[in-house]
């Protein structure tokens, strides 16, 4: 169903290429996961190009739980422990403790403050002491291997920003409908058309990555 609805946007490879081009230009992309999984669409931006206006959109148009996807080595470098010792969530979403920048924020809730926190966390020289805990940004630890290991939005985000040649850090939030329900693919496609954002799926990223591996092989 998802693939047929997305057929007008080209092949899986073409959809991923459109997403990578958007990220390189500092724009957002919409990624839908498998229909038999969450079947939700996330709005994703590269962390290094994230603007206050884009954060405001994430807060306004999405669930408000803005997450910062980071690879395992960055999570370890920042000494961010898992949110809980035993993760019993349905899909094993790897939340760490929430964070706040220690410098340059007020309450930490505003769009500008959340961007400041994200920029502090992704800085090349970032230290654990640069971040207070808890806060209003929710880091997610991506599994090594990306979507070929786990078909989640966290891994899809890291795969996309890396494939785009950007720093391995991305920001995501689940898109919601005006009535507060979760947006599914038809609504995600309409949202993408309204905001001129490409739409792709986790399966598309899997296909793209496997095609790259086949070329190497």
Swiss-Prot record:
Keywords: Lyase, Magnesium, Manganese, Metal-binding, Riboflavin biosynthesis. The record marks 136, 174 as: Essential for catalytic activity. Mg(2+) 2 binds at residues 38, 153. Its EC number is 4.1.99.12. One of its GO terms (cellular component) is cytosol. Mg(2+) 1 binds at residue 38. Its cofactor is Mg(2+); Mn(2+). The keyword Membrane does not apply. Belongs to the DHBP synthase family. Homodimer. Catalyzes the conversion of D-ribulose 5-phosphate to formate and 3,4-dihydroxy-2-butanone 4-phosphate. This is 3,4-dihydroxy-2-butanone 4-phosphate synthase. The lineage of its organism: Bacteria, Pseudomonadati, Pseudomonadota, Gammaproteobacteria, Alteromonadales.
